[in-house]
């Protein structure tokens, strides 16, 4: 693991942009932050859309994310899992 891996973090703003780019779902970052414990379905993002986000992040960071990332139900859970994986390099 390199020191750079420790600096990787997906923000709410990045997640909002990924939702728009990979799934065509527009959610304002402020709203996403305020409702981070609401289900992805509340924002119109389905499991296929989440899979696209996971694939984009794996490509961006060059590592496989935990399988559970594809099954996260809320943005808060997703960001916690993904950022934990990026921090440890798993």
From Swiss-Prot:
A Pfam cross-reference name: PP-binding
Entry annotated with the keyword Phosphoprotein: yes
UniProt cross-references to InterPro entries, sorted A to Z: ACP-like_sf, PP-bd_ACP, Ppantetheine_attach_site
The Carrier domain, residue ranges: 9-90
UniProt keywords, alphabetically: Phosphopantetheine, Phosphoprotein
Domain of life: Bacteria
Phosphoprotein keyword on record: yes
Free-text description of this protein's post-translational modifications in UniProt: 4'-phosphopantetheine is transferred from CoA to a specific serine of the apo-ACP-like protein.
Sites of O-(pantetheine 4'-phosphoryl)serine modification: 47
Its job: Involved in developmentally regulated synthesis of a compound biosynthetically related to polyketide antibiotics which is essential for spore color in Streptomyces coelicolor.
Protein name (record): Probable acyl carrier protein
